[in-house]
Swiss-Prot record:
GO cellular component, one term: mitochondrial inner membrane
A family per Pfam: Oxidored_q4
Database matches in Gene3D superfamilies: NADH:ubiquinone/plastoquinone oxidoreductase, chain 3
Name this protein carries in UniProt: NADH-ubiquinone oxidoreductase chain 3
Amino acid sequence: MNLMLALTVNTLLTALLTIIMFWLPQLNSYAEKANPYECGFDPLNPARIPFSMKFFLVAITFLLFDLEIALLLSLPWALQTANLPTMIKTSIMFITILALSLAYEWTQKGLDWTE
């Protein structure tokens, strides 16, 4: 009996909430709600607007350096390895490549946003 009462109450409550869900949005309908929203872009404008290649290159550079930093995060746990000299040489080589790539990006004006 208790189980039957709980199932009935749950079913009625679900039906009531479903009816309210379909009925309530029709009360406050206005033109702005009917328009599609796509992340701040106007869907009626042409989709092929000019894209800043500088922004794209900075974004790709950020992703590459972010990935390299994520690989460096495991370095403290790697210090517990049995083959410590190899791990240190590899880490120093990795950090050197990271620093050289940053210096190259800097000298090629890849990090300048003002141009």
